[in-house]
């Protein structure tokens, strides 16, 4: 019998201004080279730009964007009998949110534009409306899972 204790599940802390865990998760993914204050600056500027563009609550736009990009299912490479199959697997809510945030930031970084705050705000507004690269990535993932549904029993 193992003597190790059970590990407490880590909960994401909330950010100082909005007291929101999603904002903190987003800041931690924006973060580069340990410059967290810069990551906070970028996100807060993006939130201000969202407020100016949409004239609605920017946190609801952020939630809507992440909800729209969060995948329900993904594909995982699985080697069976010498060939590799893309096996569709269901994704939990935490992992789905993490993927959504990663896709949103990747799409924002690829966008042409002046600075990261501008690009991030544009991507979040587009995702909330149901367009943009991050939404396309989610749809592509769902299409891949649907196409490989025959391999679902390999889980």
From Swiss-Prot:
Protein name listed in UniProt: Small ribosomal subunit protein uS7c
Any one Gene Ontology BP term: translation
Record key words, sorted: Chloroplast, Plastid, Ribonucleoprotein, Ribosomal protein, RNA-binding, rRNA-binding
Subunit structure: Part of the 30S ribosomal subunit.
Subcellular location(s) of the protein: Plastid, Chloroplast
Organism: Beta vulgaris
Gene3D superfamilies assigned: Ribosomal protein S7 domain
Domain of life: Eukaryota
Pfam family for this entry, one: Ribosomal_S7
Major location (coarse): plastid
PANTHER family documented for this protein: RIBOSOMAL PROTEIN S7
Function per UniProt: One of the primary rRNA binding proteins, it binds directly to 16S rRNA where it nucleates assembly of the head domain of the 30S subunit.
Signal peptide: none
Keyword Chloroplast: yes
Family membership noted in the UniProt record: Belongs to the universal ribosomal protein uS7 family.
GO cellular-component term (any): small ribosomal subunit
HAMAP family for the chain: Ribosomal_uS7_B
GO MF term list: rRNA binding; structural constituent of ribosome
UniProt keyword annotation of Chloroplast present: yes
């Amino acid at each position: 019998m193992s003597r190790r204790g059970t590990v407490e599940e880590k909960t994401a802390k909330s950010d100082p201004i909005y007291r929101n865990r999603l904002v903190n998760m987003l800041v931690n993914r924006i973060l580069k080279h340990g410059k967290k204050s810069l990551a906070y600056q970028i996100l807060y500027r993006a939130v201000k730009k969202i407020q100016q563009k949409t004239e609605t609550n920017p946190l609801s736009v952020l939630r809507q964007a992440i909800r729209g990009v969060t995948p329900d299912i993904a594909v995982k490479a699985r080697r069976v009998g010498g060939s590799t199959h893309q096996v569709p697997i269901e994704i939990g809510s935490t992992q789905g949110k993490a993927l959504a945030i990663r896709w949103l930031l990747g799409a924002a970084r690829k966008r042409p534009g002046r600075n990261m705050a501008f690009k991030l705000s544009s991507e979040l507004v587009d995702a909330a409306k149901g367009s943009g690269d991050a939404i396309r990535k989610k749809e592509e993932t769902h299409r891949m899972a649907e196409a490989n549904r025959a391999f679902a029993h390999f889980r």
